[in-house]
Amino acid sequence: MKYCLLCLALALGGCQTNDKLASCKGPIFPLNVGRWQPTPSDLQLSNVGGRHEGV
């Protein structure tokens, strides 16, 4: 029984970490920020829909 407790204490002690938790900073989706601006033709309703629309 003593050996089981010793092994348990060592196993749980090995799981201890001093690393900080991950944290997010900044915008949620920062990809291509400032590189693409929609043109008036991009905002037209004729461009909306998938390849199956109107089939």
Swiss-Prot record:
InterPro entries: VirB7 (IPR035545). Pfam families: VirB7 (PF17413). The keyword Membrane applies. Residues 1-14 form the signal peptide. Keywords: Cell outer membrane, Crown gall tumor, Disulfide bond, Lipoprotein, Membrane, Palmitate, Plasmid, Signal, Virulence. A lipid is attached at residue 15 (S-diacylglycerol cysteine). GO terms for cellular component: cell outer membrane; type IV secretion system complex. It is found in: Cell outer membrane. One of its GO terms (biological process) is protein secretion by the type IV secretion system. Its main location: membrane. It is a lipid-anchor. The keyword Heme does not apply. A lipid is attached at residue 15 (N-palmitoyl cysteine). Homodimer and heterodimer of virB7 and virB9; disulfide-linked. Is essential for the biogenesis of the T-pilus, which is required for virulence and T-DNA transfer to plant cells. When is associated with virB9, might function as a nucleation center for recruitment of VirB proteins during assembly of the T-DNA transfer machine. This is Outer membrane lipoprotein virB7. The lineage of its organism: Bacteria, Pseudomonadati, Pseudomonadota, Alphaproteobacteria, Hyphomicrobiales.
